[in-house]
Structure formats: C-alpha cells, structure tokens
From Swiss-Prot:
Name of encoding gene: Negr1
Lipid attachment, kind GPI-anchor amidated glycine: G318
Location of the Ig-like C2-type domain: 32-128, 133-215, 219-307
GO CC annotation: dendrite; late endosome; neuronal cell body; plasma membrane; postsynaptic density; side of membrane
Protein name as it appears in the record: Neuronal growth regulator 1
Length: 348
C-alpha cells in the first residue's frame, strides 16, 4: 500500500495523543478490550475487498488507522495516497477500514486506535491475503529414447503454498507422489503420453497444465499374415509393425527387393502396417516373402512363405478313381458272402 510520506503535522491535540500513544506508550502487540468483538486475523482472497472492522464509542471519540507505523487515516483525514482505501460510514460509530482489490503487498498488521476523553484504545488486525495457485513454469514437451532417465518440472506460486501433484494420463493412469519434480528412470514406451501437473491450495480451482512425452523405440513386427492364394486371382500379405518414429517398410522376395507396380505388385505402407498385394497370382509369385521395418533406432524383419493351394480335397487322401474301385470291390465281396450264406441255408 502506498502511504503518504512523513512530514504531515498534527493540527490538533487528539491526533497528537493518538500518535504518541500508538508509537510510544503501548507495547508492541498489546491489545485493549473493547465493548465489541475484536478480530485478530482476517483471510481475504487476492482481488477481493477487505473490511477491517472498528467502531467509535460515541460521536465525540476520534479514530485513526495505521499500517505498521504508517498512518492511513486520522479521523476523517486520509493520509494514504492509495485510492483503494477508504473509511466505511455505515453509521456514526462505524470506523472500519476498507481496502479494495487487495494484493499480497497489503499483508500485515493494522491498528485501529480510538481516542476517548480518558485513554486511547487500540485493536490490531492481521490481514492475510490468500492467492490462488498459478503454475508459472513447467517442462516443455519432449521426445526421448526408450531407456532414458527423465525429470519433469512443475513450479507454482500461491498462498498458502500450493500442493503439486502429477498424473499420467493413460488407460492405466495412476497418481504419483506429490512434488515439483517427477523422476522417471529408464522410461519405457508404455510410459509415453501426457503428464498432468496440478497445483492446489483450496483458495480457488487447481491450476492444471500438461506435458507431452514422446518415447522413441526401435521397430517391432507384431504379425505377418497372408490369406488364401489362388492362381489367377489376387492375393495379399499383411505386415503389422510398431515403432517411434513410425517405421519405413520394405518387401523382399528371396533376396530381391520388391517395388510398387513391379510385376503386378501393389505395396501400401501406413504408420503401423504394410500390405503387399499381387493382382494376378501366377506360379512365379510363390516363394518366401520378407517384410522389413526400420527407423533411426533399428531394423527388424519377418518372413512368410507364399505357397500354392493344396489340390487334395478335405477328408480325401487318395484319388477319386481309387476310391471308386475300392467301393466297387466292397460291393462285390458283400454280394458273394450273401450268396454263400443263402446257399448253405437252402441245403440245410
């Protein structure tokens, strides 16, 4: 609070008595009983209006307000040049100090002194300005390699001092220990994502900010698979992979690299998969195919043979002709046996 500089003179005896009693006669921190309830401490949120209550005993008594040793008001005279301060005048006895848009610089002790015909009476109020939490510094988004040690930083101000907590935003999100720093040792790909810092002190809503962590890792091929391949028709092989940065895919048949548009081959590459399609399968297309996935951290591959379909039908282990012959033989033997038993029965 900006107060008028020293140099103002006392123009009447009661003001001199007030100043002398406040600055000389009363020990620091001493309070005198009032006929009204005294307020020892007041909590006000930053930006709000604080009203420090003080009352005169009668219309003849005079009052004064001080902040530490600086005079704010003496009677109806304002000594402070701060436009935010004023005296409340709800009634003749009301001599409350009003401070608009309070700030942390308004923190501290305030003294109201009432000068009567006998002795001055004083009341002290300690004003505490509470400040909502505010995160003023947090780690930037980062990209690091898997296995690296990481420290995330989140700094905040507020009064009371805010409690800082961290949370990993993921399907298996779990809170970490409170603190300005979050240490992650040997970070894994599963620990990539957004980390949320929250600063809270119950004065207002928590202040929340996020850090995005990208974890690079070498590619892996999770699956390589083909569908039914029939000569004269289309066939495809699908290669599923993962890696950060996203891997680049290549295809080989044996030792020969394949390219899109070569001999009826179509290659479609995506961030996590590659699809090789043969538009018109011939005998030359059968063989061993290899999918290669690579990024700046490494290379991996997986192979799959592309074979022609089997000519044997389900449940049949021989030719149709052989099966027909066996069936005919079985019928012939059955007929011979039946005739033999019938002849024996007639003879008996």
């Amino acid at each position: 609070m900006v107060l008028l500089a020293q140099g103002a003179c006392c123009s009447n005896q009661w003001l001199a008595a007030v100043l002398l009693s406040l600055c000389s006669c009363l020990p620091a921190g001493q309070s005198v009983d009032f006929p009204w309830a005294a307020v020892d401490n007041m909590l006000v949120r930053k930006g709000d209006t604080a009203v420090l209550r003080c009352y005169l005993e009668d219309g003849a008594s005079k009052g004064a307000w001080l902040n530490r040793s600086s005079i704010i008001f003496a009677g109806g005279d304002k000594w402070s040049v701060d436009p935010r301060v004023s005296i409340s005048t709800l009634n003749k006895r009301d001599y409350s100090l009003q401070i608009q848009n309070v700030d942390v610089t308004d923190d501290g002790p305030y003294t109201c002194s009432v000068q009567t015909q006998h002795t001055p009476r004083t009341m002290q109020v300690h004003l505490t300005v509470q400040v909502p939490p505010k995160i003023y510094d947090i780690s930037n988004d980062m990209t690091i390699n898997e296995g690296t040690n990481v420290t995330l930083t989140c700094l905040a101000t507020g009064k009371p001092e805010p409690v800082i907590s961290w949370r990993h935003i993921s399907p298996s999100a779990k809170p970490f220990e409170n603190g300005q720093y979050l240490d992650i040792y040997g970070i894994t790909r599963d620990q990539a994502g957004e980390y949320e810092c929250s600063a809270e002190n119950d004065v207002s809503f928590p202040d929340v900010k996020k850090v995005r962590v990208i974890v690079n890792f070498a590619p892996t091929i999770q699956e390589i698979k083909s569908g039914t391949v029939t000569p004269g028709r289309s066939g495809l092989i699908r290669c599923e992979g993962a890696g950060v940065p996203p891997p680049a895919f290549e295809w080989y048949k044996g030792e020969k690299r394949l390219f899109n548009g070569q001999q009826g081959i179509i290659i479609q590459n995506f961030s996590t998969r590659s699809i090789l399609t043969v538009t018109n399968v011939t005998q030359e297309h059968f063989g061993n195919y290899t999918c290669v996935a690579a990024n700046k951290l490494g290379t991996t591959n997986a192979s799959l043979p592309l074979n022609p379909p089997s000519t044997a039908q389900y449940g049949i282990t021989g030719s149709a002709c052989d099966l027909f012959s066996c069936w005919s033989l079985a019928l012939t033997l059955s007929s011979v046996i039946s005739i033999f038993y019938l002849k024996n029965a007639i003879l008996q």
